[in-house]
From Swiss-Prot:
<dbReference type="InterPro" id="IPR019310">
    <property type="entry name" value="Efg1"/>
</dbReference>
<feature type="compositionally biased region" description="Basic and acidic residues">
    <location>
        <begin position="313"/>
        <end position="338"/>
    </location>
</feature>
<comment type="function">
    <text>Involved in rRNA processing.</text>
</comment>
<dbReference type="InterPro" id="IPR050786">
    <property type="entry name" value="EFG1_rRNA-proc"/>
</dbReference>
<protein>
    <recommendedName>
        <fullName>rRNA-processing protein EFG1</fullName>
    </recommendedName>
</protein>
<feature type="compositionally biased region" description="Basic and acidic residues">
    <location>
        <begin position="44"/>
        <end position="59"/>
    </location>
</feature>
<feature type="region of interest" description="Disordered">
    <location>
        <begin position="280"/>
        <end position="370"/>
    </location>
</feature>
<keyword id="KW-0698">rRNA processing</keyword>
<dbReference type="GO" id="GO:0000462">
    <property type="term" value="P:maturation of SSU-rRNA from tricistronic rRNA transcript (SSU-rRNA, 5.8S rRNA, LSU-rRNA)"/>
</dbReference>
<feature type="compositionally biased region" description="Acidic residues">
    <location>
        <begin position="354"/>
        <end position="370"/>
    </location>
</feature>
<dbReference type="Pfam" id="PF10153">
    <property type="entry name" value="Efg1"/>
</dbReference>
<feature type="region of interest" description="Disordered">
    <location>
        <begin position="228"/>
        <end position="256"/>
    </location>
</feature>
<keyword id="KW-0175">Coiled coil</keyword>
<feature type="coiled-coil region">
    <location>
        <begin position="132"/>
        <end position="189"/>
    </location>
</feature>
<keyword id="KW-0539">Nucleus</keyword>
<dbReference type="GO" id="GO:0005730">
    <property type="term" value="C:nucleolus"/>
</dbReference>
<feature type="region of interest" description="Disordered">
    <location>
        <begin position="1"/>
        <end position="107"/>
    </location>
</feature>
Amino acid sequence: MASSSFQKQGKRKDMADDSISFETSKRHRGDYRNSREASPIVRDGQDDRRKYIDRREPGKQPSRPQIRDSNTFGGAQPGQDDHAYAAGRSTSKPFRSRDLDLPSANELKNKIRDTKRLLKRGDHLPADVRIEKERALVGYERDLEIVESRKNRAAMIKRYHFVRFLERKAATRRLNKLLKQKKTLTESNPNLDKKELDFVEEQIYVTQVDLNYAIYSPLTEKYISLYPNQRRDKKTPEPDPEDSNIIRNNSGEKPPLWYTVEQSMKDGTLELLRDGKLGIGISGQKTSNNGPIAVLGRKNNETVSGSSVATEGDSKQQGRKKDKEKQHDVKKSKEQEGSKNSGPRRRDVHMDDQNNEDGDDDSDGGFFEE
């Protein structure tokens, strides 16, 4: 009884005192080694590692991988972006892909707005800084064009993806069926009719063009179905005046881009046609001012369609012309008002004021009416 109480007291004492270490007996250690000591194999590996570390240069530290931020427009160093754009090179690292290079459209719009504000109010800026900011602004605008074109392209791909998939599967089935039919005709019948074989080969060629149309039709254009559902309403819709030159496929006719795909098969430019680098629209013809524009600080394969830039410039010019015409009309009206100060004119104005007080708001005073 006394021994058991002594053991309990010793256990409590050991639990309270952290300085007392518990050691196992020698017979439970195994080869009289400490339980925390490494095995001989592990110890030899550690020694070899230490020898290798000791052979390195004394002042050299082990290299640590640096974590780089994928967003180069994070705001930590905004000056570097302007320097890179002004120098005509990209701000991204060489190993970064092209998709990670460009920021979002909102970030680019904020950059453009801030740079325009700085150039508008910064009369005190040095000449070299102003030139650098102007070049950076051009780069931001071009990148915004690329980002928006990518967004539109992704939207068109998502919209017509399932239709393309179904028509590609249908064209593949037809092609396999025709190839099997040709094989049976050539192998089973020695006295084969040449007209029948030519007809099958023609159908094979048309089906191959159909398959390439479903795959390589421009992703940025509206996709016209080759195999419309016959169970739908058979009433032919009235053609729009804007799309009068576009052939609809309700009567079994091939769309205009089908012949463009056929020509691209001969020229070997199917990939360029699919990416929209040939500048061909839905009508099968090249659109006006749709040539590729080289982007400042970008690779040659990253281009912007010229139609968007041209339309934007035309709209800006039209807006400026309208503003000038309005200013000219206002100036003319003011001159007429100053030259005509006779009594009857004043009486008319006074009567107009009374009419306006009565609630008649149809007139603007007679100066700006046409």
